[in-house]
């Protein structure tokens, strides 16, 4: 027994020793883990310091790059401003040279025209006068014949065009009428369909409402009847309860008093027996009658409830049908609205077409009147009706010729002004609105120049703003220039011939004309001469400036090419800047990935080292730390 007690006492001691040894081992491992944890904390702090240093270096590099980019932009801006200043000065010098050259050309032409005018005023011999008169008449006749043929050809072309326009207009009107008739028919059919559907729906709704009202009246009547019957049943029940109480009282009285006949008088006993028998018989009949009435009333109530449920079902069905009809009518209503809108649009389009037709007819009438007026004027001013005996008619005809030429010149000037305005407006819309640049670019002051030079300079600027884009535009410009030259030469020749013919006629007529009339005609012709000279100078300026357009266009193309090169250079620099930014961002991302990879490798190395040493318990705290 003692040995067994000893063995039992040794076992707890061995267990406690093993537990203490295990605790000591665990404490040693815990201290090692804490030491390693402190080492890892120090490593993490070092890595954070490295990260801060890398961020500082990256920020410094970014600042250096931004400073370099700003320096490049400043240099580029300075170079651009210098180039623009040099180009502006060169253009100003060139414009001044061109202005001086045009002034010299104008002075030479003015002197030449003055010399020719003096020669014409001095006069010549009679033979020369007659020859000039014959030449003038022949040339005027030829020009008149050519103009008449041209006008006749134009009249034929206008008639053909008018005929085509009238045919197209009639076709359009017929098509519009047919389309309008179709639309009206479709609209009418649609309206009829809508009205029919509305009438049917209203009729169905009225019928259903009448049925609902009739059923509601029936329900109210049945409810009233039910109320009356319930009142009667309640009254009968009350009577029955009263009779039951009387019967109970009579039975109690009979039970308590065994001989009621002795106590009561004989007459009273007989009456009580008779009353008791009658009351019992009446109670039985009343009970049967009440039971029958109650059964009838219950059956009536069941029928009314069934009918009420049927009416409720019918009402729900009618409501459902009304909702379905509303849902079906909704697209029809929307379609009706759309058709109404389309009809309004078609009416507006028909009104516009009618207005266009009225305007076309009005233009046609005006064109007819104009053609008839021109034909009458040409008939009145025909050169075939002239004769040497009618000097006044000759003078009037020449005056009409001068007026016609004046109208032609005025039309040309109006066309030129219109082109100037349109091109000026186009130039204003195309060019940046920098007023000082325009003034320094052309060297003009707004207060010192007159309207003629201002219009000419604006015309020049607007023409120079237009760069020739295609060979077709160049061909159009050359053709318009040749036509302007030919028209200018023809006008000058006709004007000189008319002046010579008018002078010869004045000499032939002599004193037959009135002095005041002659003075008026002379003043008018002088004014016409001055105005024509001004128009001739304007046309000469235009021709000279048209000749100078080529050089200006080339210079402008060079300027545009330089601007395009500068813009491409700026675009390349911006692309390089964006590329550098993207590279910096990629480097930053790569650096962060490398830092994260370093942390992973360090943690993995520490875990591998601990596992190789045999410390299996360290795996759980390492995972918690991660």
Swiss-Prot record:
Any GO BP: protein transport
Keyword terms: Coiled coil, Cytoplasm, Cytoskeleton, Membrane, Microtubule, Phosphoprotein, Protein transport, Transport
GO cellular component: cytoplasm; membrane; microtubule; microtubule cytoskeleton; ribonucleoprotein complex
Residues where Phosphothreonine is found: 470
Signal peptide feature range: none
Main location: cytoplasm
Ranges in coiled-coil conformation: 13-255, 284-413, 490-604
Function: Associates with microtubules and may play a role in the microtubule-dependent transport of the GABA-B receptor. May play a role in JAK1 signaling and regulate microtubule cytoskeleton rearrangements.
Family: Belongs to the JAKMIP family.
Protein name as annotated: Janus kinase and microtubule-interacting protein 1
Species this chain originates from: Mus musculus (Mouse)
Phylogenetic placement of the source organism: Eukaryota, Metazoa, Chordata, Craniata, Vertebrata
